[in-house]
A protein has these predicted regions:
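Catalytic binding pocket for nucleotide-activated donors in carbohydrate/polymer assembly enzymes
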Residues: 14, 19-20, 25-26, 32-47, ...
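Short, structured coil segments at secondary-structure junctions
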Residues: 117-118, 144, 165, 251, ...
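Residues at the C-termini of beta-strands that transition into short coil/loop
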Residues: 79, 125, 152, 173, ...
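Extended catalytic core of nucleotide-activated donor transferases of GT-like folds
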Residues: 6-159, 262-267, 271, 287-289
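Hydrophobic anchor at the start of a short beta-strand
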Residues: 36-38, 121, 192, 230-231, ...
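Extreme N-terminal starter segment of soluble prokaryotic enzymes
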Residues: 1-5
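Conserved catalytic-core segment of nucleotide-activated headgroup transferases in glycan assembly
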Residues: 156-277, 285
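Short, polar loop motifs at secondary-structure junctions
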Residues: 106-111, 151-155, 236-242, 311-315
Length: 376
């Protein structure tokens, strides 16, 4: 059985981040469904000062999650580039040499000794726009890879605003393991919701700033004033962001802590499935570059039969929008999108699930990636 390794830097170190856990698990499930031996390699840095979790706790939670998901012993954690959990260093080196493909999410694996052992090393860009800007500024390890994939469906196209420096980025949609995300009844679903971080990375290209999600949310801060539909944001936003918190609450946004409302893999799934629909902006950098980005969180809503209303990143060139998946560019369009979903919720719900089944099913997405990587 052919082996494929999927990497991360968030598996063990961020147990509260259920969405990040699901991100990797969807790739792994898709590979397993296609008959591959799938391994999860997590690169864990030294815990930050004041961390709530000890090293042993983080590894134990990660181990239990892998076992619950059916990975058995197909996992490893490399701590601070030195200590290995889950398998010996020698076994990990041997596995890297045997694997037919490395799926290196966000370039998580940087160890050249391990990288050079792989037959095929695929860099997976999950931050389109930012990645291409940063590649102009410093060594991101792209040269250590021979394959390049991005969730930015417009990357490299004429309307994508950042030069790609000769890299042949191949595009793909975020995969989802549909068997773990059955369509849900809308009987108890009241709120439009989303889950995410308020702040994030910035990048500068030709003296112009490309910013995080907060920049875009503040453009649409008045939306709750234009609808009777409750909108709840499970956002990591620091208590010192007093002006932003006041603006959000003052305009009627409901705010909850994602580490309480949607913590861990099961908590994240429950929160998504108990929502009526998703409403979310995108990071300013995704919008400004016209990246064609679709969130790996959004696909969880779609698979659950939850319609989504998300900010336009140029996605409509590649996916049909208007039923189940709706996009907006202005405050007025966002308000109309909410009205449209609520006016015919059942149809939008069915369309959301259908879109996921037809375009996002993990085996289908991974099969296309593997074929383009030359892996059969």
């Amino acid at each position: 059985m052919k082996k494929v390794i999927v990497t991360s830097t968030w598996g063990a170190g961020y147990p509260e981040g259920g969405g990040m856990q699901w991100l990797n698990l969807h790739y792994l499930a898709g590979l397993q469904a296609l008959g591959f031996e799938a391994f999860w390699l997590d690169l864990l840095g030294a815990p930050k000062k004041g961390s709530k979790h000890s090293l042993d706790e983080m590894v134990d939670v990660f181990r239990a999650q892998c076992e619950q998901f059916g990975l058995g012993e197909h996992w490893a954690v490399v701590y601070d580039n030195r200590k290995t959990f889950g398998m010996t260093e020698h076994l990990l080196q041997s596995l890297c040499g045997d694997a037919v493909l490395l799926i290196n999410l966000c370039g998580a694996l940087k160890d050249n000794d391990l990288l050079r052992r792989f037959q095929n090393r695929a860099y997976f860009d999950l931050d389109p726009g930012f990645t291409q800007i940063w590649a102009h500024e410093w060594d991101m390890g792209l040269s250590q890879h021979n394959l390049f994939f991005t969730v930015g469906l417009n990357v490299g196209q004429p309307d994508f605003s950042i030069p790609v420096r000769g890299i042949e980025w191949q595009t793909f949609l975020p995969p989802i393991a549909l068997e773990y995300w059955p369509a849900q009844s809308a009987a108890c679903a009241a709120n439009f919701t989303t889950i995410g971080q308020w702040r994030g990375q910035y990048a500068v290209w030709q003296d112009e700033m490309y910013g995080p999600k907060s920049d875009e949310f503040l453009r649409f801060v008045g939306l709750p004033q234009k609808t009777t539909q409750p909108i709840e944001l499970a956002l990591l936003i620091h208590e010192t962001e007093t002006d932003d918190l006041a603006a959000l609450r003052g305009n009627g946004w409901r705010l909850v802590n994602p580490h309480q409302a949607a913590s861990g893999r099961d908590g994240f799934r429950s929160y998504v499935q108990q929502s009526r629909a998703e409403f979310s902006v995108a990071k300013h950098g995704y919008v400004k570059t016209r990246s064609g980005w679709l969130s790996d969180r959004t696909v969880c809503y779609l698979a659950s039969g939850r319609p989504v209303l998300v900010q336009d990143t140029g996605l409509g060139r590649h996916l049909s929008t208007g039923e189940g998946l709706l996009t907006f560019t202005t405050l007025e369009e966002a308000a109309r999108g909410i009205e449209s979903i609520n006016a015919d919720y059942a149809s939008h719900s069915v369309a959301a699930r259908k879109l996921a089944e037809q375009n996002l099913a993990a085996p289908k997405v991974l099969q296309s990636i593997l074929e383009r990587a030359g892996v059969r």
